[in-house]
Each structure stands twice: as structure tokens, then as C-alpha cells.
Amino acid sequence: MGQAPSSTAESNGRELDLRLWSPVIVAGGESMAVGNVVDRDFTGDLPDECLAHVFQFLGAGDRKRCSLVCKRWLLVDGQSRHRLSLDAKDEISSFLTSMFNRFDSVTKLALRCDRKSVSLSDEALAMISVRCLNLTRVKLRGCREITDLGMEDFAKNCKNLKKLSVGSCNFGAKGVNAMLEHCKLLEELSVKRLRGIHEAAELIHLPDDASSSSLRSICLKELVNGQVFEPLLATTRTLKTLKIIRCLGDWDKVLQMIANGKSSLSEIHLERLQVSDIGLSAISKCSNVETLHIVKTPECSNFGLIYVAERCKLLRKLHIDGWRTNRIGDEGLLSVAKHCLNLQELVLIGVNATHMSLAAIASNCEKLERLALCGSGTIGDTEIACIARKCGALRKFCIKGCPVSDRGIEALAVGCPNLVKLKVKKCKVVTGEIGDWLREQRRTLVVSMDGDETEAVVVVDGEVETVVEEPRVAQAGGIVAEIGSSNGGGGSRLAMIRSKLGFLAGRNLVTCTFRRWSHNDNASSST
């Protein structure tokens, strides 16, 4: 008794399930056999556009495996893949035709070759440019066999290019000028360790017939004769971002030439450069500057910072790494507090600021949301207590390598009402107990201290970096994970670069934490 009704209900439920998950609508009560349902490939009902959209959510390995499922998936994967990264050895040249027959929609291409291998040639690069006419972003790394002529042929075919990044290549100024001449839509240019640029190289400039330029960002890194870019930097009216990092030679004159033109610069990064207060005085003429990084420039002093503060009143983000030279201190920071009232982010590394300047900044810069104080012997409990009392808008606060004790951290329990993240590192007097106590007092505050992290060493672009993972219980037992990184010793290539740079050699203490804070809050800061 009860067996027959149960069997009927079970059968009806199975048929209902088939109707629910099958995309085929059975008309007129037509039934579908279970065997046919199992054998049916329902992905065949998906349009190619939907299948391509699904592929976009897969990682690189999963997407490669999916492309081997059937011929259709292989075709859809090739037609919908817009980003491609290739090992640019010379042996790849014979496969380029078949490769780009499959991947015919590539818009972002990266070609990388290791130092021990022979890279692809000018002919191979020209073939790529013919097959990929819609390229908008190109990255070349270690392609030492590519010459100026190869870059010129490439530029003639890739006229839609918007972003170009080259590093460790052997072509020179002629190749860069060819890109500027033919790629009218180019917006971002990044040049790193370009060996073809030497003292006898021609100047890099916009073409004479160029009525306007689309260039918005230029990054020059580790160049021996980077001053050849002076005409380009001085005449590009659309330029918004300029980064000059670890380049040899005197850069004061270049900055003066930029300032004498009608500059639209809003972001300037100067790192490990031979630049003095003369260069900072030139930067002060760029009144639209909102972001300024002065990192390990030992000839810069309070006088240069005062020039900038008095004229660049739109300044929102200021990073200073004084390299413990004691040339930038209270005097320059007091000027920042007086004139830069829109300041939202301040990072001080190796700067001996005291209660005097920090109190002025805390009182006057009412929009200050992100603050980092690192490697200063003059920042103690008094300074932290002052910040806690006066920085009402502060949201993220980092203290690293300063003589701060538990008493200073205690002040943050009642101060800085909008604080959401606190990081305390390498402060030897601070104990772990104060961190636990602070979490109890402010349950919405994420507190990260030395005892909370585990480190792992990884290699990124040939340079050793330390990745720090910091799991910490926040409110209601939730886990907050945060990743930070800082540059470590580095391999032989990095050591060679540092030995060439002489006085510029040293360890970069600017951690990714500050960059991440800046990027995460960029949208909210600009509104």
C-alpha cells in the first residue's frame, strides 16, 4: 500500500525537472526521452556572442582548456580573444600566420623575450602589424632584434594605437619618432631601458605637421640620455601625467622648458633623479598640478617645496621621500599646510616632521583622508595624539618605523571618527596588546600590525618583491584580507642598474599600500 502513488509522483517530478532545465520547449504535450536529454548538447543553442561572453569570465588556463572542447568553441575563443601575450622568441615567426588566422580580433598585444633568447625580427613585427590592424595597446619587452626600421613599419600599419610600452629594446629615437608621426591617437607612452637612446641620438619630438597631439601620459624610466625627450615634453599641450624615474643626468633644465610652455600637467612623479630646487621652482609654474611625488631627490629642500606649495594650490596628493637627508622638514610642510587646503593624501617617508608642522596640516587641511608617516625619528606619541584630535576626515592612517608607543595608539580610540583602516608597522615600542584593545574599542576599524602578517617572496618583471598577506578579524568575526608589497633586493639586472645610478641607489621604501589607497579612492577624491 502506498507504493503506486509514490512511483507516479516520482515520475512526474522527474519529467517536471526535465522541462525546467531543458531549453527546448516541448509543444503539444510531446514527451522527451531521458536518453535523448542526456545526449543533447545544450550549449549548441547558445549564440556565439553568449558563449564568448562566458569565456570572458574564465581564467587563462580554463579558457585554453575550453577552446579544446570542440571546433566551435575553438573558433569562438579565437574570434573573441582581444588580449594576447606571446613569448616573442625568433622561433615563433613561422607560426605567426596561423596564429593570427585564429586570433583575428586582438586589440591588446604583449611581446616578451627573455635575455638569453633571440627575439623576433623586424619582418615578424611587420607581419603582426599587417594582421592586427586594430591594435590599441602594445607592450614590447626584451625585443632586442627590433630596429628603428621595424618600428617605423609597425607604426605605419597600427594607426589606431593608443598605448605603447617598450622596455629593454635596442631601437632608438628614430623608432620612437616614427610612432609619434604615424600613431596620431597615441595617448600613453612608457619607455624603460631603451638602449638605442644615447648621447648622439636625435631629439624626440612631435612631427612638424602635427596640429594637435593625443598624448596624455609619458613615463620615462632608467634611461641613460632621457633628456632627448625634452622637445616632446615641452611642446605636448595635452600632457597630463609625467613620470621620470631613475633616469641619469640633470633634469632641472627639462623641467624649466616644460614650465615655460603652456603646460596642462596635473600629475608629476620624480623619483631618484638629479633634480634640485630649481626644478621644483619650475614645477610650481604648473598651477594645475594635483598629484606630486618627490621621491629620493637629495638636492631638493624646503625652499623648493615652498615654491610648489605657494603656487600649486590645487594639490590633492603629495608624496615626499626625504631619504633621511633632513633637507625637507617643518618649514616646507608649514607652507603646505598654509596654501594646500585641498590636500587629501599625504605620504612622508624619511622626513623629520614634528608636532609643529603636523598640527598645522591637521588643522588647515580639513579634507585630508589618507596619511602615511614612515621612517621618521621625530614622530612620536605627541604627534599621533595631535593627529587624532584634529584630523576629523582621516580615513586611512599608516605609521611605519616611527618611535611611537602604545600611548600614541591609544589616542586613536577616541580621535579620527571617520578612520576605517590603521596600519602600524616596525614601531618597536608598540605591542600587540594595544592592537587587540583598539579593535575592541572600535569594532568597525581594521587594524593591521606586525604580528598579523605572513610574507612570501615572488618575482615580478624580474624584480624580487615581498607580498604581505594580512588576515585580520574585523567586526562580527569577519575576515579582512589585504595585500601589500615592497621592493626587495632584486636580481643581477636590478643590481647592475643601481650600480650605474650611483648616488641614486638605495632601497625603495614606498610600499604598494599607499599606491593602493590612492587608486581605490581616486574616484571619490575627484568628485
UniProtKB/Swiss-Prot annotation:
Keyword tags: Nucleus, Ubl conjugation pathway
Gene Ontology molecular function, alphabetical: ubiquitin-protein transferase activity
Subunit and interaction comment: Part of a SCF (ASK-cullin-F-box) protein ligase complex. Interacts with SKP1A/ASK1, SKP1B/ASK2 and ASK11.
Entry's Gene Ontology cellular component terms: cytoplasm; nucleus
Domain F-box residues, every copy: 39-85
Main function: Component of SCF(ASK-cullin-F-box) E3 ubiquitin ligase complexes, which may mediate the ubiquitination and subsequent proteasomal degradation of target proteins.
One of the GO biological process terms: protein ubiquitination
Entry-linked InterPro entries: F-box-like_dom_sf, F-box_dom, Leu-rich_rpt, Leu-rich_rpt_Cys-con_subtyp, LRR_dom_sf
Alphabetical list of SMART domains matching this protein: LRR_CC
CDD domains membership: F-box_AtTIR1-like
The protein's name: F-box protein SKIP2
Source organism per UniProt: Arabidopsis thaliana
Free-text comment on this protein's domains from its UniProt entry: The F-box is necessary for the interaction with ASK proteins.
Keyword Nucleus annotated: yes
Pfam families: F-box-like (PF12937), LRR_6 (PF13516)
Cellular localization per UniProt: Nucleus
Pathway: Protein modification; protein ubiquitination
